[in-house]
Design a protein with these regions (language model features):
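Short, solvent-exposed loop/beta-turn-alpha elements that line the ligand-binding surface or hinge
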Residues: 117-130, 198-209, 222-243, 290-292, ...
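A structural signal for short loop-to-beta-strand junctions that line the ligand-binding cleft
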Residues: 86-91, 95-97, 123-164, 197, ...
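Short, well-ordered beta-strand elements
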Residues: 35-46, 65-70, 97-98, 146
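C-terminal capping/gating helix-and-loop segments adjacent to ligand/active sites or protein-protein/ligand interfaces
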Residues: 230, 354-360, 374-426, 430
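Extracytoplasmic "Venus flytrap"/periplasmic binding protein-like
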Residues: 57, 64-133, 137, 165-174, ...
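Glycine-centered hinge/linker elements that transmit conformational signals in sensory
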Residues: 182-187, 229-260, 291, 302
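Extracytoplasmic/periplasmic solute-binding protein
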Residues: 142-150, 155, 180-233, 275
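Hinge/lid segment of periplasmic solute-binding proteins
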Residues: 101-154, 180, 195-196, 211-214, ...
Length: 435
């Protein structure tokens, strides 16, 4: 081989070697540089100062990840979130990477959500860490999990301690018959026969804050199977469902009612000291504390039918990830991080700096800590037995049920025909939204 060819081969070898070394060096440098991920997180009640310290901690532990927390109005949140997720599928309209969803929404929202990867949390771990209602509520028809709860909440009895003491009760009775007897004893009427002190706020919809939640609880108590397995049909006119509905409206229709349509909103009347017992969640307790410090009140488990298995009604929120997120895996890692005991405690502590208590812990392992707080004690007792209904179209279904309650309780309509009419409307909607 002549010298010229040797020189060319030598140069080629040097060039090839340089390219190989450069490629290796670039690969090493790129692998050592953290990936840049920007995520948007939609919340609606926890203020920036409550959530931001946890976001800062996650960002410090995961260089390159930037999370923006955006507070949304709770009013119309369901339709706002759904519209954004829907538009993000077909356009460049931005949707949140991470968002809060109600425990009843999964059938409607599932098509726009990213399932929880087993690499982040397995189904087995999930079922051990969270209450049975969370497993049922956040699992889609495809068997995949679509949200992690950062809280647990549900209906409780909020009671005026002074009014109960005056009538000889320390706490509301836990069996249904004794509870109703107490409600009757605690109801007072004026000379014209009208209620001036309600023993129990129940039976209407326009002036009862949680009317549909109470009705759903009655369905559970009466073992009414109101929702089909695929979540596309509601059965509101079965004998058990009708009996539960009629029981609810009977509280304002019977001879000696404990409540009436002419009374103010139950929360307002309770704050005025004129309601002995009402149904509400932990967030209603916070509202009462904000409105007044003059009412000494307690929170008790729901009364139940003693011959049935224990069951209580859950209404709470989970945290999910959008299918169109820029990085679904990183988003889910952050959600799991928020759900860890250390972070839940810190969230609670941050919130408790500005209000009486933080979000009730969602993890089964933290139940004893819930039981230590007088405002969450009842939740700690009921949480293992809570259930709900995955209706999907929560706002629509609840509005139709409120209309039915008003039609029957206040306008004297037939419950059967009224419920048949709204059932047809609801099922037409669910057949599209929950498919």
């Amino acid at each position: 081989m002549d010298e010229k060819k040797k020189k060319i081969l030598k140069i080629l070898a040097i060039v090839v070697g340089f390219v190989i070394v450069l490629s290796i060096l670039m690969a090493v440098l790129s692998s050592s540089k953290p990936k840049q991920v920007e995520l948007t997180f939609w919340g609606f009640w926890e203020e920036e100062e409550v959530m931001h310290p946890l976001i800062e901690k996650y960002e410090a532990e995961n260089p390159g990840v930037k999370i923006t927390y955006a507070i949304q109005p709770l009013k119309n949140y369901e339709s706002l979130l759904y519209t954004r997720l829907e538009q993000a599928e077909i356009s460049n309209e931005p949707a949140p990477d991470i968002a809060m969803i109600h425990n009843s929404w999964v059938p409607k929202f599932r098509k726009y959500l990213s399932p929880l990867p087993s690499s982040v949390m397995s189904a087995d771990e999930y079922s051990k860490e969270f209450y049975p209602t969370a497993i049922e509520d956040f699992t889609g028809n495809d068997g995949k999990i679509y949200a992690i709860p950062l809280q647990i909440d549900g209906l409780m009895i909020i009671y005026n301690k002074e009014l109960l003491r005056e009538a000889g009760y320390n706490v509301p009775p836990t069996d249904w018959d004794s509870f109703m007897e107490a409600a009757d004893n605690l109801t007072k009427r004026g000379s014209n026969g009208k209620i001036i002190q309600s023993g129990l706020a129940i039976g209407t919809s326009r002036n009862i804050t949680h009317s549909t939640d109470i009705l759903f609880y009655f369905y559970l108590q009466n073992l009414a199977q109101i929702l089909s397995e695929d979540k596309t049909m509601m059965e509101l006119t079965s004998p058990r469902a009708l009996a539960a509905f009629d029981k609810y409206t009977s509280f304002v229709k019977e001879k000696n009612p404990t409540w009436a349509s002419y009374l103010p909103n139950d929360l307002t009347y309770f704050v005025d000291g004129k309601v002995a017992m009402m149904f509400g969640t932990s967030w209603r307790a916070l509202e009462i504390l904000e409105y007044t410090e003059n009412i000494e009140f307690g929170l008790a488990p729901l009364p139940r039918l003693t011959n049935n298995d224990e069951v209580y009604y859950a209404t709470y929120w989970g945290t999910t990830v959008s299918k169109t997120s820029k990085d679904t895996l990183e988003a889910w890692k952050f959600v799991k991080f928020l759900s860890e005991p250390e972070q839940l405690r810190r969230l609670y502590q941050n919130a408790a700096k500005t209000r009486a208590f933080g979000e009730p812990y969602s993890r089964v392992s933290m139940n004893a800590e819930l039981a230590e707080n007088k405002y969450t004690q009842a939740l700690a007792y009921m949480a293992p037995y809570m259930k709900s209904f995955q209706v999907g179209e929560q706002a629509f279904v609840e509005e139709k049920l409120r209309q039915a309650i008003t039609a029957v309780a206040e306008n004297g309509r037939s419950s059967n025909s009224t419920l048949q009419a709204i059932q047809n409307e609801i099922n037409a909607r669910l057949a599209v939204s929950n498919k």
